[in-house]
């Protein structure tokens, strides 16, 4: 756990996050996007909880859960296709946001922002967004992080958020390298 969190700063950061108008507006937009995505194939779509805070080693997140009852005979692959990518990686309106991402980002995101999971033989679908993960390709290790940039964004705050997200990955590399040296 981050030393700042254990020194009691976690509560300060939590209050700052909950009071941040941009973060709250962004989160509300993402919850609405999730509701809209699920409404395509679900009934009884509801928000189970809204804007809970979850602490991770280097970041604090606002977390909500949106759920619904999948309509009978819904194809799980179509359900995945119609809800992918998650709004947290695209923004809204989703189609236009994806067009802008394709236009402005200098390269394809690859595995980042994709998903990993399974579709069971019984139609069960379970997947997770591939963020804060490593990709090993041709002897090189790749990792990345991002954030929601909007007109109201504060550049320094957004950069710090990305660096905080990358902090856990950098820490994992440091720990792996130190174990490698011990075992050498």
Regions found by a protein language model. Give the residues of each.
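Extended alpha-helical targeting/anchoring segments
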Residues: 1, 7-184
């Amino acid at each position: 756990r981050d030393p700042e969190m254990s020194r009691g700063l976690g509560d300060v950061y939590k209050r700052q996050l909950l009071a941040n108008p941009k973060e709250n507006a962004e989160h509300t937009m993402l919850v609405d996007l999730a509701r809209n995505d699920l409404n395509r194939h679900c009934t009884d779509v509801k928000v189970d909880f809204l804007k809970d805070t979850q602490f991770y080693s280097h970041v604090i997140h606002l977390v909500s859960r949106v759920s619904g009852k999948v309509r009978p005979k819904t194809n799980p692959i179509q359900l995945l296709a119609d809800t992918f990518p998650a709004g947290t990686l695209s923004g809204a309106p989703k189609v236009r946001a994806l067009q802008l991402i394709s236009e402005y980002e200098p390269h394809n995101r690859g595995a980042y922002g994709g998903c990993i999971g399974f579709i069971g033989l019984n139609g069960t679908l379970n997947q997770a967004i591939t963020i804060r993960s490593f990709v090993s390709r041709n002897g090189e290790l790749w990792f990345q992080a991002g954030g929601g940039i909007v007109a109201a964004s504060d550049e320094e705050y957004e950069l710090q958020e990305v660096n905080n997200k990358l902090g856990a990955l950098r820490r994992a590399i440091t720990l792996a390298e130190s174990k490698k040296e011990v075992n050498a």
